[in-house]
């Protein structure tokens, strides 16, 4: 009963609202986002390409207003900058200081309660969580899209890909399972399937936060396990719940698990991703789904199945290796 209640749309939305207000009234969180050069510059380029003079824009979750400011520089008719936290007062002051406030209307409101007198040409947002869906992006965008977006309107960014990639960690970054530990003179291997260990290997045990420097290399050519187009999807229930994956190793190494990251796609030329192995987006973190260490040679096949209890909650995701 409790599990079903947690997975209901109403409760999911309420929990997401509570979490986001708490997190994004912390100025440090906004400082991290503003300091993320890849994030800021990609959004600036995408907005310059996709927002046109005369557009009506709604900026969902404006925070300190940086996306609304970029949008205002494109000579729109109006930008509605909305946020349900009081940080919007800071955004308003920043806009006034930068003399861009005349094109922006700041509204402290939950997006589901937003009512406008005109339809919008563009939904601008950064509702992207570390595991892509965990800031309730799909539900929030679809609600605005279905109520306010003009036919043929644009969602910026509108397409995404989720990756769970076989990865080798650095020796310093790898934490072996307890049964893999080689302690001089002691044997822990019997704990692998021991019933006494079972209660400690549930829920979030098989995934952990990964420091960016801990990832050494990917073992396969990256391929998304799923993609989503916010202009087309009717709800998060459209996304697959179970995804079998079969990957061929292109770079020999030790498979220590699966690295979780996402790609945000503005158009064919403007995109970014959160993989820690190249242009770093430090304001997003990465999870690792752990696996017993396995040495892989070029041409080997790594097979696994990814299942999603609730796409917005990584603690309900599971990975089973063949």
Predicted regions located by residue number:
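Class I SAM-binding transferase module
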Residues: 2-60, 64-307, 311-322
